[in-house]
Curated annotation (Swiss-Prot):
Cellular component terms per the entry's GO annotation: cytoplasm; nucleus
Disulphides: none
Lineage, uppermost ranks: Eukaryota, Fungi, Dikarya, Ascomycota, Saccharomycotina
Protein name as it appears in the record: Acyl-protein thioesterase 1
E.C. code: 3.1.2.-, 3.1.2.22
Molecular function as annotated in GO: carboxylic ester hydrolase activity; palmitoyl-(protein) hydrolase activity
Keywords: Cytoplasm, Fatty acid metabolism, Hydrolase, Lipid metabolism, Nucleus, Serine esterase
Localization per Swiss-Prot or TrEMBL: Cytoplasm; Nucleus
Pfam families per record: Abhydrolase_2
Family: Belongs to the AB hydrolase superfamily. AB hydrolase 2 family.
Enzyme class of the recorded protein, top EC level: hydrolase
Species per Swiss-Prot/TrEMBL record: Debaryomyces hansenii (strain ATCC 36239 / CBS 767 / BCRC 21394 / JCM 1990 / NBRC 0083 / IGC 2968) (Yeast)
Superkingdom field: Eukaryota
Length: 232
């Protein structure tokens, strides 16, 4: 059940909440690793009415990661080889995490009366991959996607299993050109794949010299994107 999914939940300070952001962390991180974002959003004054946003930062389960010699760490799915888009992928684990994100979306709809089109999903690295896949698999429309340093582990099967509910949904993809973990070209190929599949509002943002992280410029661009989505 969705209420059992471990997450850092930051409730809107202005009631009732009118929108929600669900942001999924990357490998080895936790929900608390991104729980500073609501404060940044408020201080930046970029996102209007940010006090009426529910924030959810889910925690990944612990699992052995093959590419790290089997070391157990928080992960949304196993990684067999870093930086290689052609490497073997943990398809079952990946889909399980997509189901987790779907449950969190439905939690906001069912328990907090947030309209689906006012829910933005997103994430960093593994979390971005899960968010990008989930928006393609959902059978109802959400507000938008923020994918930072993202990729698609299911690029071969996605055309056969995707739904079309979110073809008009705006998607923000940001990627640093110096990323050694998720190669920049892997991110760019994912953006091109989504455009080829019929997603009409995919915007790929390039950040020169940025490694596997989110720069201040990227975060500001993401917040401007969120503001545009939520004010519609």
């Amino acid at each position: 059940m969705s209420q059992l999914i471990p997450a850092v939940r930051v409730a809107a300070t202005a009631k009732p909440a009118k929108s929600a952001i669900i942001f999924v962390h990357g490998l080895g991180d936790s929900g608390s690793g991104w729980s500073w974002f609501p404060q940044l959003a408020k201080q930046s004054n970029i996102i209007k009415n940010c006090d009426s946003i529910n924030y959810v930062f889910p925690n990944a389960p612990l699992m052995p990661i093959t590419a790290n010699g089997g070391y157990v760490m928080p992960g949304w799915f196993d990684i067999y080889e870093f930086g290689n888009p052609e490497a073997k992928q943990d398809i079952d684990g990946f889909h399980k995490s997509c189901e987790t994100l779907k449950s969190l979306i439905k939690e906001q709809i069912d328990n907090h009366d947030i309209p689906a089109d006012k829910i933005i999903i997103g994430g960093f690295s593994q979390g971005a991959a899960v968010s990008l896949a989930t928006v393609a698999l959902l059978d109802f429309k959400v507000g938008g996607v923020v994918a930072l340093s993202g990729f698609s582990p299911i690029k071969e099967s996605l055309p056969q299993i995707m739904n079309k509910a979110n073809l008009e949904t705006p998607i923000f993809q940001g990627h640093g050109t110096a990323d050694p973990i998720v190669n920049f070209d892997f991110g760019k190929q994912t953006s091109e794949l989504y455009q080829k599949l019929g997603f009409k509002n995919v915007k790929f943002h390039t950040y020169p010299g940025v490694a596997h992280s989110a720069s201040e410029e990227e975060l500001a661009d993401a917040m401007n994107f969120i503001d545009d989505v939520l004010k519609k």
